[in-house]
Structures are given as C-alpha cells and as structure tokens.
C-alpha cells in the first residue's frame, strides 16, 4: 500500500511517529478499542524502560481497511502491537445497530476540528479543517496518543445493565476462514509483521452476553476456528476479555465500554497483558 491511500490524520501521524524516541506500543482495532486510555496505561506499566502507547483505533475498522496502513505500521517499527478483535471484524454483514455513532458524530470524530456548521457547508468546513489541522494535532498530549479518533461526548454515557438487557442484538455472517476476506487480510498483515520482527498480541474485546446470544452457532464456530488459526497456525498469543465486565456498569452499549473513569478497568486489564508481553 502506498502512503497516498491514507487519510490526512494517518499520514500526519506516521510521518511524525519517529519523533518519539521511547519504545512504542500500538493499540490497533475498531471502536471497541477506543475506551483504552494510553496515558493511564503508560502510568500503569511504568518500568525501567519508558513506553509510549498509541491508541490507533478507528470507527468501523476491520482487517480489510487496516491493511492500507500496513507499510506505515511496519515503518514505524513499534515494539509491540496489541490487536483488538471481535466477531464483527470477520463478518461480512454485521449490523451497525449500537456499534457506531450517528453520521454527525462520525463526521465530528473524523474531522480534525470541531466545526458546528460542517454539515451546512461541508466544502468550507473541509477547507477549514485542512488549514488548521496541523495546529491541533501537534500538541504531543492525549490527542497524539489517539490520533485517529476524537474523544467525543457520545463515548462517555453509561447505560444501566437493566437497560442493556432490553437491547436485542442481531446475527452476523462470518464466512469460513478459507473464504473469509477479513481473515485473509489479517493473516497477510500478521505474516508481514513477523517478517519484519514485529511482535503482535491479539485481545478479544468485551461484548455483552445478550449480543453473543443472537449470533448463530455456525457463525460462532467459524469465528472460533479463525481465532484458533490465529493462535496455532500464526503462533500469536490470544487473550480473551470477551466475557469480562458482564455485571459491571461500565457499558455505553452492548458492544462498547465507556470512556469515562469507571471504564478504566478495561485499560488496566489490557495494561496487565502488556506487562506479560514486554
């Protein structure tokens, strides 16, 4: 993949990542990984060696889209890659119910600036964003640690377990691994990472039991076979947090942990896994 296939935010991040001399850890995944707080995790894993953690999660990400960044990730030479996966990462028609914010929220999240009138004048809003982008993203603080998404209000509200239990999930089609394009692209990335001596660990991200129950057994089995192939055939360590936090009120919907303070337990559990792997 060439650099010009990347979004502006991606190009900017990868072109500046070498300014960080510390050992680097990349968190890669979809919106399921957005609750992970890099600064909190850095304090949690503080050791003799200093690590800079970057949460590269993106809404609706999957292996088919992430592979566009493959060359850039390799060039960045992270010391460890934590890749978050769940059922939808290997599905072909996963429902977006309760998975993604609305269109306005998605635009706000992916436009580098907060532009209230963006939808009224998209052209002007886009030009303003490009003009001011570099002023916003070069601060070197929490924003550069979450370069591909903005910390928006919709990431914080906590839904009670009683309310969550009323939400009905839906099935999703997960092809067998031999015909699964998502898995084939994931496998290609993992092989390239290995060729370049990059260490990868997979974490299965949390999901409420009510969502899992709506997935048919054949699709669950296909997912399990894919995860087994990742663990055995690709020789990648896989940690599952899928069934964690079921009874804890830290969810903003059935598939996502809140970015608010109660959700930091997710960051801490991933940090514990990092400590085992570094």
Model-derived features: positions:
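Histidine-centered active-site loop/cap adjacent to the catalytic His
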Residues: 253-278
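Secreted/periplasmic serine-hydrolase-like ester/acetyl group-modifying domain
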Residues: 85, 99-196
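Substrate-gating cap/lid alpha-helix
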Residues: 207-241
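Active-site segments of SGNH/GDSL-like serine hydrolases
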Residues: 153-155, 190-215
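N-terminal secretory targeting modules
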Residues: 1-24
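Residue-level recognition of beta-strand->loop/alpha-helix junctions
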Residues: 55-57, 204, 240-242
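Membrane-embedded segments
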Residues: 27-28, 32-114
């Amino acid at each position: 993949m060439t650099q010009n296939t990347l979004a502006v935010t991606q190009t900017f991040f990868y072109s500046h990542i070498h300014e960080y001399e510390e050992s680097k850890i990349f968190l890669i995944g979809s919106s399921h990984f957005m609750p992970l707080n890099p600064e909190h995790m850095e304090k949690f894993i503080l050791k003799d060696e200093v690590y800079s953690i970057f949460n590269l999660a993106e809404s609706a990400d999957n292996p088919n889209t992430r592979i566009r960044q493959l060359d850039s990730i390799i060039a960045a030479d992270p010391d460890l890659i934590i890749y978050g996966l769940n059922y939808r990462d290997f599905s072909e028609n996963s429902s977006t119910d309760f998975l993604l914010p609305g269109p306005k929220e998605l635009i706000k999240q992916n436009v580098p600036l907060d532009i209230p009138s963006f939808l009224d004048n998209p052209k002007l809003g886009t030009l303003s964003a490009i003009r001011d982008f570099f002023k916003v993203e070069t601060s070197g603080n929490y924003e550069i640690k979450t370069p591909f998404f903005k910390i928006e209000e919709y990431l914080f509200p906590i839904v009670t377990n009683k309310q969550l239990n009323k939400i009905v999930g839906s099935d999703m089609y997960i092809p067998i691994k031999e015909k699964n394009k998502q898995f084939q692209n994931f496998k290609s990335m993992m092989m390239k990472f290995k060729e370049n001596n990059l260490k990868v660990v997979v974490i299965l991200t949390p999901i409420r039991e009510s969502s899992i129950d709506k997935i048919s057994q054949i699709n669950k089995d296909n997912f399990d076979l894919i995860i087994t192939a990742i663990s055995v055939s690709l020789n990648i360590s896989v940690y599952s947090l899928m069934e964690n936090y079921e009874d804890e009120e830290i969810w903003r919907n059935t598939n996502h942990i809140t970015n608010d303070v109660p959700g930091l337990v997710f960051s801490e559990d991933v940090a514990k896994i990092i400590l085992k792997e570094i």
